[in-house]
Every structure is written in C-alpha cells, then in structure tokens.
Regions:
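Short linear motifs embedded in intrinsically disordered, charge-biased segments
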Residues: 1-209
C-alpha cells in the first residue's frame, strides 16, 4: 500500500529539530528546555551548604548537557551566539548569587566560579571534534558524502546561506590554522585532540554583557 508522507516545516529526530530555517528552531527549543531545567533546579543554586564547584558541576552536567545537545551541527548567526551568551551569563549569575544590578563584569563571574570556557567556545570545540570524526570516516559514509557533496541547480537570489563547513573554516581560523591543516590533523584522532588543546579558543566573554 502506498503511504502519503506529510510535509512539515520542522520535525524532531533523535532529539534534534530538523527544520527549513537551519539551526534556528533547534536553538530555540534547546534554550527553552535548558531554561526550564535550570529553573527546576533552583533549590540547588540557592543552597548555602553547596560549594560553587558543586553547583558548577551540576550546571555543566545537567543544564549544559541539555542546552548543547546536537550543537555540533549548528550553524549559528551572531544574534544566536549573543542569545546563548546572555542566557549563559544569566545562569552563571544565578549560581553566583548576583544579578546584573550588582554590576559585576562577566570576566569576574567567570573567575569567581573558576569557569574557563564560554558557551560559544564549547560549541566550537564540539563542532571541531565532530568535524574530526567525519574526516576519519570512510568516503562511502553518508556524513562524508554530505560534507563533500555539491547540490546542482540554481541558487536563490541574495546572499547564500552559510554552510556548516564554512563555519568549521571560521573555527579553524580562530585556532590559527587553515582547513587543509585541520583536515590532515583530524585524520589522527590523538593528534587532532592535541591540536584542539594546543590552540585554545578565545574564551573571554565581553565584560559589557
């Protein structure tokens, strides 16, 4: 029997949102899920008997685990990066027990909590690790085919959408290497891990946010 497939603008597959707007819907959904989880753990954030270290560990394990799920596939716009950074600072200020009215700079919040990498650096590292994983796959694997494939036909008018590989190239530039060096380095898992460690991301947040 024939089965008619329903057309939709977005659907959830393996926990990630696949949509026409790229990463936008998935980012919004993840922000909503993470915010709800963070609020449900309020008793932990306000607990006087728990150390900063313990609270940060809970935050990184639970909240970031939800927020950053599937983030290695995201192609983020500047607006989305800013939204994620503001959300992160809202969370961290709550953990530290301060608000924006206290006029404490972001870098000082990071220092107090011994928190070394901002959320966009974490996403960048996850994306590069996933890029390395794809590079080590065989050419016949679907992720490799999609990464290296080209879509034939006319492009729509206007500025073309940024591809995932374009973002990876920008990530590599942040590390001070080019995409060709990254591709060669990624073929060796241990070497790629070392490269990511030796070329740390720019982890300082803007003190104005």
């Amino acid at each position: 029997d024939s089965y008619q497939l329903k057309q939709t603008d977005a659907f959830v597959y393996l926990g990630g949102t696949i949509s026409r707007d790229g990463s936008e819907s998935d980012v919004k959904r993840r922000i909503g899920l993470a915010r709800g989880l963070f609020q449900s753990l309020n008793n932990i954030w306000i607990a006087k008997e728990l150390s900063r270290e313990t609270k940060v560990q809970v935050y990184e394990t639970l909240v970031l685990g939800v927020l950053l799920y599937n983030s290695e596939t995201w192609t983020l716009k500047v607006e989305q990066k800013n939204r994620l950074r503001v959300l992160e600072m809202t969370f961290l200020r709550k953990i530290e027990g301060v608000t924006r009215r206290d006029r404490i700079r972001n870098v000082d919040i990071y220092a107090r909590l011994n928190y070394h990498r901002n959320i966009n650096d974490r996403i960048r590292e996850r994306r590069l690790r996933y890029f390395g994983h794809i590079c080590r796959m065989g050419r016949e694997r679907y992720p490799t085919i999609v990464l290296n494939g080209h879509v034939h036909g006319r492009r729509n008018r206007g500025r073309p959408k940024k591809r995932w590989l374009d973002v990876v190239k920008e990530d590599c530039e942040e590390m001070g290497i080019n995409i060709h060096e990254a591709t060669r380095g990624a073929m060796d898992r241990e070497r790629w891990t070392t490269m990511l460690t030796e070329h740390p991301m720019r982890a300082q947040a803007s003190p104005r946010l």
